[in-house]
Every structure is written in structure tokens, then in C-alpha cells.
Design a protein with these regions (language model features):
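An active-site-proximal "capping" alpha-helix that borders the catalytic cofactor pocket
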Residues: 29, 73-85
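His-Asp-centered metal-binding catalytic motifs of divalent-metal-dependent phosphohydrolases/nucleases
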Residues: 47-69, 75, 97-106
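Divalent metal-dependent phosphate-bond-processing catalytic cores, especially two-metal-ion Mg2+/Mn2+ enzymes
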Residues: 14-23, 27, 31-46, 60, ...
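Hydrophobic, well-structured mid-protein blocks that either form specific transmembrane helices
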Residues: 89-123
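Short alpha-helical hairpin
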Residues: 1-11
Length: 202
């Protein structure tokens, strides 16, 4: 499996991204997801196919994110062309595409998708990236880029019940912590992630 092709693809597509969803976010997610998987499965080899799949999903997940991608369907078609060149099987490609299209927080507000094991680690790592020091930095970077206020007592946190509400409601960066980030610990899938999310939330 040629992960370098995936890394280059991600770098090219996220070049200039400045809201905390750049190539280096994908790299951190890949490193953390791999670390957590190997912690939960100590007999697994770091060069196994599932680790390569975990890293691939980690790097690719934000290349199709509607927050930063104007045409996700077009990028999905590019990924379908890319992955066979990297040595992935048709079944692996099917899983990778399902995971990167269904792992986001917004995709799971109205319906919870049960992801294959690799996707559970990537989803957990992506959410953990929103916690702790790096998570705070990313939240304020994203809020500033989109012109959100840091705090406004007249704008109350909302209970998120739909994708459209999540994308379109008026929020402040402080509210984002109460609407989403403080609840992420309870959404973890895997043993290692539950421990790390608890540590960062505390």
C-alpha cells in the first residue's frame, strides 16, 4: 500500500486551508488513531494493512468535508481513481469511502452510523483533536476565520438535533464548547480513545 500517494493527494487538496482542517490535522489524526489502535491491539503490526487503512482514512477525511470542500462528489471520484494506484482492494476502497463520508460529527447528529473498526479509531482520533490545547486552538481559529464572536451572552447554546441546524445556526466559539466539544468524551468508540478523551476533557 502506497500511503505516500494519499499524503500527496491530501497536501494538494488542503493546500492553503487555515481553519484547523489542514494536512497536519490529518497527520495528527493518523498518528493518534494508529497509536490508539496499537494500544488496544498490542499484537498487531505497525505495518499491517489495517494500520495503512487507518492512516489513509485519517489523511483523506477532510478532503471531502463540506465545510472546506466546494465539490465533495468530485473529490470522491478522484479518491476512487487514486486508491487502486495505492494498492487498495475494491473492498478496502468501499470501506474507506463509507467511513470518510459518514464519520463526521454532523453526519451523525440525526442518525448514528456504525463504522468498521478502522473508522472507529479514525473518528475517535478526529474528535480527540477537538479536545485539549490543540482543540482549543482549532476552535478559536475556525471561529475567527468564519467571523464568529468569541462570546455573546445574548446568544445561548443550542441542543443540536439536525445537520442543517448545526451548519446554519448562529453560534459563538464559547458556545461551540457547550454544544459539541464537552460532549465528545461520551461519543468515543474504542477503549484507548475513551481514556484519552477523558484525560483531555478533564
Amino acid at each position: 500500500m502506497n500511503i505516500e500517494l494519499v499524503k500527496k493527494f491530501t497536501k494538494d487538496h488542503l493546500k492553503g486551508e487555515k481553519t484547523g482542517h489542514d494536512y497536519y490535522h490529518g497527520q495528527r489524526v493518523a498518528n493518534l488513531a494508529t497509536k490508539m489502535y496499537l494500544s488496544d491491539y498490542p499484537d498487531a503490526h505497525k505495518d499491517s494493512r489495517i494500520v495503512a487503512i487507518i492512516q489513509t482514512e485519517s489523511y483523506l477525511h477532510d478532503t471531502i468535508d463540506e465545510k472546506i470542500c466546494d465539490n465533495p462528489d468530485e473529490v470522491i471520484d478522484e479518491i476512487k481513481e487514486l486508491l487502486p494506484k495505492g494498492g487498495f482492494t475494491s473492498l478496502e476502497i468501499e470501506d474507506i469511502l463509507f467511513i470518510i463520508q459518514h464519520m463526521s460529527f454532523s453526519a451523525n447528529i440525526e442518525h448514528h452510523y456504525q463504522l468498521p473498526l478502522s473508522g472507529q479509531y479514525v473518528q475517535d482520533a478526529d474528535r480527540i483533536e477537538s479536545l485539549g490545547a490543540i482543540g482549543i486552538a482549532r476552535a478559536f481559529t475556525y471561529g475567527g476565520k468564519h467571523g464568529n464572536k468569541i462570546y455573546d451572552p445574548e446568544i445561548k447554546p443550542e441542543k443540536l438535533i439536525s445537520h442543517d441546524q448545526y451548519r446554519n445556526h448562529v453560534e459563538t466559539t464559547i458556545n461551540h464548547f457547550y454544544e459539541k466539544l464537552f460532549d465528545l468524551e461520551d461519543l468515543m468508540n474504542t477503549p484507548a480513545a475513551k481514556k484519552e478523551a477523558h484525560r483531555r476533557t478533564e
